Amino acid sequence: MAVIADPVSTVTGLLNDNWVSGNTDSRTPKVGDSWDIGKTNMMKKDLIKCYEVSGTHEVGLVGKTLDRGTWRVSVDMSTPTSRSHLRNMYGEVLRIMRLKEVDPNSSYQLLRPVSRVDNTDKNKRWFRYVLDLELTSYEVIS
């Protein structure tokens, strides 16, 4: 039986394994699950936290032998540097997601960006985007 992988670990793994620091001013952010990163001083480094926002599970598709899971995972990017550096980080995340949107060697069927929110501090002390991704995967039921 194929088991649906953890969606948050899937996204953090993709970011860590495919990040090209040359696209972000030769800097690689700290990337991790929100529960692994814990409290981190956002004023000192680039940071990407990933966490699950919601998920659904449809049981019994295709003659009751296939389950489909759909999750929304947030990719929370922040930097104290500048808005242009944040845009570079955002561009790199999108590049990776487009590269891996449909990957036959992955634990998911489809990964796509859904929405983005600008949560930049109004005093411009730190710059932040939250990008929501939708991840779909299937599990074979025996």
What name fits each language-model region?
Residues 61-67, 121-124:
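Short, solvent-exposed beta-strand/turn "edge" segments of beta-rich domains on protein surfaces
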Residues 57-60, 78-83, 138-142:
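Short, cysteine-centered beta-strand-loop-beta hairpins and adjacent loop/turn segments enriched
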Residues 65-81, 127-138:
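Oligomerization/assembly interface segments of phage tail-like spikes and tubes
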Residues 20-30, 76-88:
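N-terminal short leaders/motifs
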Residues 21, 94-142:
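Acidic-leaning, charged glycine-interspersed low-complexity segments
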Residues 1-63, 100:
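Small/polar-rich, solvent-exposed N-terminal microdomains that initiate assembly or binding
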